[in-house]
Amino acid sequence: MATIEESLALIGRGAEEILKLDQLQARLATGKPLRVKAGFDPTAPDLHLGHTVLLNKMRQFQQLGHQVIFLIGDFTGMIGDPSGKNATRKPLSREDVLANARTYEEQVFKILDRERTEVRFNSEWFGQMSAADMIKLSAQHTVARMLERDDFAKRFGSQQPIAIHEFLYPLVQGYDSVALKADVELGGTDQKFNLLMGRGLQEHYGQAPQIVLTMPLLEGLDGVAKMSKSLGNYIGINEPAIDIVTKTMKIGDELTWRWIDLLSFDISLAEAARLKEQVAAGELHPREVKLRLARELATRFHDAATAEQAIAGWHAVVTGQGDTSLLPLQEVVVPDEGLRLAGLLTAAGLTPSNSEATRKLKERAVRIDGEVVEDPSRVFTHGFEGVIQVGKRNFARVLLVTA
């Protein structure tokens, strides 16, 4: 059994803030398993690595013997979380929410231990709540308090509309903690206001206030913006292993350490520090560290054999040796007259623009099936299939098709 110090070290790994740490220490000292809650609104059908930051922390609590509650916000999903939004979010239909919720249940157990997980839906209590009960809940906070939230304050200051139902969202999320008698609630840094709302409501209803633990928002593949499906800088946990490997191997060297901190179970903080020292001293290539992370992620969401096959496919492209047919085939739609090479590189997502594609060609940084190509006007027509590589990290196995 872990000591309190060991528990705090694991719980604190990667965490942005713990409120309040002394209360967490006191509850750990009782030896009683904590009820650890994290809520997910099923606004999209698939989870990506950004979502798993919270799931990983839940798994760490499970490793310490605690019970986690994976709360599916089927009720709140129909409201739409306004956190970080500069405009009112379009609510989802009941059918969309339930369909997405089913896929969430299938995906989370790639990380969480079923035996120590409660899956709950907040429609369990909100579906029974009367209009009078909702009004009583709304009376617990003022409009002035809601406007303390940064996103609401900005929208109010710029005269952007804020719908009444958006003010309800923090209260509704906070009441989830009352209904579940949560000891700890996890959330992203953008959720802090809502999580603190839960503490206040628990006290109002005579419960001990939950400990709030916030986790950073994971940067996506570009290393800049928050991982998001809409930005295209994400890795979905249901993606093929080869995609998980190839995308992970494309991230910047500095971002690798951030991902290890927030996503890895196998690499401890102490080992990560040693690896970083070895890389800095030139004793270890950063690619080897990245490859270890890619293998861990592909194994977690698939299995060891599939992960090794994916790594073999990636290695075949990088070295020019091996079986490139292991790479996923990406279909690129081309007009009947075909597509020039510069346009093909852009259409395949290997360069952001035709001008950048032309520049890469002039630098002799483009290969097709291992051979350097330079002519931007070379035309490719439907039926062409090959592995195109731009620089060291960007490559794709493409098949040209007509619309």
From Swiss-Prot:
Organism domain of life: Bacteria
Molecular functions (GO terms): ATP binding; RNA binding; tyrosine-tRNA ligase activity
GO cellular component entries: cytosol
Enzymatic class: ligase
Binding site for ATP: 229
Motif extent ('KMSKS' region): 226-230
UniProt motif ('HIGH' region) ranges: 42-51
Keyword entries, A-Z: Aminoacyl-tRNA synthetase, ATP-binding, Cytoplasm, Ligase, Nucleotide-binding, Protein biosynthesis, RNA-binding
EC number, as in UniProt: 6.1.1.1
Positions of the S4 RNA-binding domain: 339-400
Main location group: cytoplasm
Record's subunit section: Homodimer.
Function: Catalyzes the attachment of tyrosine to tRNA(Tyr) in a two-step reaction: tyrosine is first activated by ATP to form Tyr-AMP and then transferred to the acceptor end of tRNA(Tyr).
Family: Belongs to the class-I aminoacyl-tRNA synthetase family. TyrS type 2 subfamily.
Record's protein name: Tyrosine--tRNA ligase
